[in-house]
Structure formats: structure tokens, C-alpha cells
Swiss-Prot record:
GO terms for cellular component: cell surface; extracellular region; phosphopyruvate hydratase complex. The active site is at residues 209, 341. This is Enolase. Component of the RNA degradosome, a multiprotein complex involved in RNA processing and mRNA degradation. One of its GO terms (biological process) is glycolytic process.
Amino acid sequence: MAKIIKVIGREIMDSRGNPTVEAEVHLEGGFVGMAAAPSGASTGSREALELRDGDKARYLGKGVLKAVDNVNGPIREALLGKDATAQAELDGIMIALDGTENKDKLGANAILAVSLAAAKAAAAAKGIPLYAHIAELNGTPGQYSMPVPMMNILNGGEHADNNVDIQEFMVQPVSAKSFREALRMGAEIFHNLKKVLKAKGLNTAVGDEGGFAPNLASNADALAVIKEAVEAAGYKLGTDVTLALDCAASEFYKDGQYDLSGEGKVFSSNGFSDFLKSLTEQYPIVSIEDGLDESDWEGWAYQTQILGDKVQLVGDDLFVTNTKILSRGIEQGIANSILIKFNQIGSLTETLAAIRMAKEAGYTAVISHRSGETEDATIADLAVGTAAGQIKTGSLCRSDRVAKYNQLLRIEEQLGEKAPYRGLTEINAKG
């Protein structure tokens, strides 16, 4: 038994200069796990609650001392003496202790930090890497793959202070034979994009996730400069590299319409889906995330009908890593992929359940960071340990993003051929 003897919570800083929760779980034998909760900017209304203090005199109300107190108080008391390898039991205890639908009593940030720290401590006690422990918890021991990175090299929306409405423009290095090669391809495209933007007299400052954030005349212009960068790097768009979008459409959904204020266009629900379809006909866009508002289920049905057989349609705000909402989507044939964010649901056990449900239904699962991150690289181990096949963890700068890429490099070095990089096959795995 990997007995828990100490649980510690503390307030640390995230990549946007806001506080977040870090937890340590100590076991008999000197084993320790430490993890931090991330934080989102564009958030779904049905996400588990991130508990903030609300004291405007301290961190502008964004302090997390209440959540930290919950770690050091009731959560600690409930978990002392428990077996850290019994992840489902630990998470169940914390969920029951909270007793609310969205974890608003203890805070999803408090529960998640402890949940992940316990998993890390358990892996240490078992003498195995975290990804191997996650694979065992997932019921898929020894089944690994290296994820295709969806690299957010141009930022807009809530992630940048510019006029681009679509939140993320991503490249996927699909012709690579390994993750290491994919990362190199992405880095070369990133550096070439900087040159392309500079040559056009455009801003090369970066957004929350490390992508460039220039002002552009239209969303199509963003795709055009990325195409130029891909070709300048010596790669062929559509063969070596494919494109992905995160529209985060809930952020510009107003009064039943989709308002692209950056380019002065307003669309109906079906009209915006038709607009996205036209972009996929001009560029090799193989994945679109949150192409409509989280509440626009009728519109999602239309978008799935016109794009679902050709494009990976990812539900982020739509599904919020929640099996209840995902099961409704599966039943109605809405989208064909789910974005997986630990802190949307608030525990490792519930996260694994969402990944399993998606895969069993023929949906793909894309593991994701948040725009507010720390140096914690747990999502890298999650992606490999569940063989999810795809990961979103930002651009090729900002150490909070690169930490995840570097952890994936280490894991690939350890696993070698046991963790294949499958490229476009992963994206085409949708049902």
C-alpha cells in the first residue's frame, strides 16, 4: 500500500501572472508527487468551478487561498492514510466531500491538483514513469503512442490583443516519422512565420500560448501567412503539414449570430458553418474546434452533416470533458472528437472516463493545455499513457508550453518503437 502521510497545498503563479493551486502528496517510503492546476481564458459555461477568492485587494480578486485552504484542510484530512495507487477511490472521496455538480465547494483547482499529485506519487512508489501508471489506470497497460502536436503558431480571440477573431491557427506536422521530427518541423515553420510577418511589417509579439498575434485584415489572411511560412520552411502544405483551427466561437456568438468583428462580417449559425466549409476548400484544414457556440446544438448538427466526414470536429466548450454531455453528443451524432482538459472536469479519474467514452464511440480525443499554464507537464504523460494520438500545448516559445514538448521528447527517448508516431492516421481515426 502506498499510504498517504501528508498533503500540502500552496498558491503559485501561472503563465499569465495569476495565482493557481499547487499540491504535494507525500507517501510512506519518501515518495512525493507534485502537480499544479491550469486555468483557461475562453471557458465553457459548464466547466467545473475554478475557486477564486474574489478579494479585489489581492491579485485583483484572483487569489486561490480558499482553494489552498481546502487542500490543507478537508481534502488532507479525508485522504490521510489512503492508498495513493487507488486513484478512483481517492478522486471519489474528494468528489463526495465536495458534493456539488461542478465542484464549487472545494474548487476543481483544489481537487485536480491533489488528484494529479497523488497519481505522480503513486507512480514514484511503483517505480514506473507517470505515463505507464496512467496507462494502467486507464486499463490499457503498455499501450502507448506519441501524439501529433497541434501547434498554435498564430493566436487571436481571447488569447491575443489583436483583431483576429478565430482564436487559434495551428499546424500539424503529419509526415514526420517521430515526435522529435514533428517538433523540429513545427519549430522551423514557427521561425519562418516570424520572418514572413516581419517582411510584411506585421507585429511579431506573441499571445498567451506563444503564437504570433499580428493584426490581419481577415481570418483567411492568417491562413495565407501560415501557408507562406510552411513553404518557406521547405514543407508542402497538405502533404507534410495540415492545418487546424480553434474558433472558440462562443466568444463571438451574440444574439444568435456569429460576429467576426475583426473583418466586419456577421453570420447566421448555418452561414458560419458554410464559411468554415469554404475555408476547408481553400486550405488543408483537417480539424476545427468549437466551430459553433456551446449551446447551438442545432447548428452543430448541421456543421457535422456538412463537414463531419472530412474534418475532425472537436468539442471543447461544447463537451467540457464531461461524460454526461459527451454521451448526449454521441447519441445525437454531434461532432466527432472531444478536447480533453483536466481542469474542465477536475479529476484524473473523470478525465480518463471521458477519453474512454470518446474512443469507444469512435470519437478522437485531443489532450489539451489551458492558456494559463505552469511548468507542470502532466498532459504529456496523459497523451502517451492513453495513446490519445493528439496534443494541443501551444507554440514553440514560452517555457510553460515548451515544458510539455520537452517531456514528450524524453518519453519518446525512453519508449522508442513502443510508442509510434502515426501522423495523419490519428486525426483520421474519427468514426
